[in-house]
Amino acid sequence: MQQNKWIKRIFVNRQVENSPLVERIIGRLKPTPVQLVDRLEEIQAELRLATDPIAESKRVLFLTDEKAFIRPCPCSPGAVPCGYWTIDLNLNCPLDCSYCILQAYFSLQPLTIAVNQKDLESELGAFLASTRTKVLRIGTGELGDSLALEAISGQASFLIDLFRDKKGVLLELKTKTSAIDSLLVSPPSENVVLAWSLNTERIIKVEEIGSASLEERVRSAERAVEHGFKVAFHFDPIIYYSGWEKEYG
C-alpha cells in the first residue's frame, strides 16, 4: 500500500508544528497540502460535510500530540480482564475492513499520528516501574493497524528500539499489511512479536479492502522470521459463509 495515494490532506496541530517528526512526515508526503489547526473539531466539522465521512476520514492525516498513551485493553462489562495493555500512537486506519468496529467508533476521526514520542518514553518508564507482573503484554493494534502508516511515520521502528532493552515486557505489533521493509534494516528484538491477522482470500478480497493478500502476509511473516523476529497469527474474525470450512481449512 502506498500511503501517498491515500492521503490527500495533512492537518497539523499548531502545538507540534515544529516537531522533527512532523517535518519528516510532511517531507515524505510531498506535495500533499498542509493546514495548521488548533483543534480536532475543526477537522471533524469538515468531515461532517463529506458525502461519505468514514471514507473521507481515511484520506486526511492529523499530526498532533497525545496526553496519555498506555491504557488497559478494553473488555466487556463483567468480563475478567486479559491483562493486555495498549499503546495508542495511531488512531484510525486507512484499511477499509467492512466488519471493523473502528468504522463506527472513528466515524469522524482522521488518520491520527501522535508525534510526541518523548512523552511516551517518560510514560512508559513510569508505567513499567510501577507495574508488578512477571510478563507484561502490550501492543499497538487496538485502535489502528500497527504498520499501515509505518512508511510515513516510522512509529513501529521507534517502538522496537524503545522496548529493546526492557525486561519482562512483550511488545506485539499487529497488522493486515506487508509493510515490514523498514523493520528489517535494524536488528530484531527478543521481546517484540510481529503479528498478522489472517483470513481466507475470499474475505480479504471482498471485506478487507486495501489490505495485503494472504500470500503477501504469509511471505512477510517468513521474511520477519528469517530476520530473527518472533511472529504470531490471529484468525480473527472467522466468518461463516458457504464453503467457509474448506477455505479456512
Where are these regions (language model features)?
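Flexible, acidic/Gly-rich N-terminal and inter-domain linker regions that tether
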Residues: 1-83
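Well-ordered, non-membrane alpha-helical segments in soluble/globular domains
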Residues: 17-22, 118-124, 154-158, 211-220, ...
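A short acidic (Asp/Glu
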Residues: 21-22, 149-152, 182-186, 206-208, ...
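Alpha-helical scaffold elements within enzyme catalytic domains, especially in hydrolases
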Residues: 24, 99, 162-165, 223
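Conserved Radical SAM active-site core
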Residues: 62-79, 83, 101-195
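Local cysteine-cluster metal-coordination motifs and their immediate loop/turn environment
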Residues: 88-105
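Conserved radical SAM core fold
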Residues: 143-147, 178-181, 192-212, 237-242
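Conserved C-terminal portion of the radical SAM core fold
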Residues: 217-249
